[in-house]
Amino acid sequence: MQINQYEIWIADLNPQIGTEAGKTRPVLIVQTNLLNKIPHPSTVVCPITTNVQKDSHILRVHLKKGMANLHENCDVMIDQIRAIDNKRLIKKVGNLPVELIENIKENIAIIIDLE
């Protein structure tokens, strides 16, 4: 299975604990391709939700219906970034639009204080 940064995959995030995103849902691959190209057993992702929040500019990045083959308006939950086992990844559904990559990078840098 080949995984690439900024692809959107369906992943089974169950079981979920507390405020973690659970269910089978889309996730955005944010892990560097340096790791994706080797046989690494886990992948860093941001879950995607259809529970869109209008005023969460740092915590979320909005994806419009139709982007990356998503069937509804969605938010990438930057604050829910985590590593998952590759066995949780079910299938690729699309790619993040290029114009949103910098926004994702900036928000991750803010969330984990890399600036």
Where are the regions that the model predicts?
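C-terminal terminal-subdomain/extension
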Residues: 1, 66-115
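Short, surface-exposed secondary-structure edge patches
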Residues: 1-2, 32
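Feature marks short, surface-exposed loop/turn motifs that line or immediately flank catalytic pockets
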Residues: 17, 52, 84
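Compact nucleic-acid interaction/catalytic patches
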Residues: 20-24, 28-65
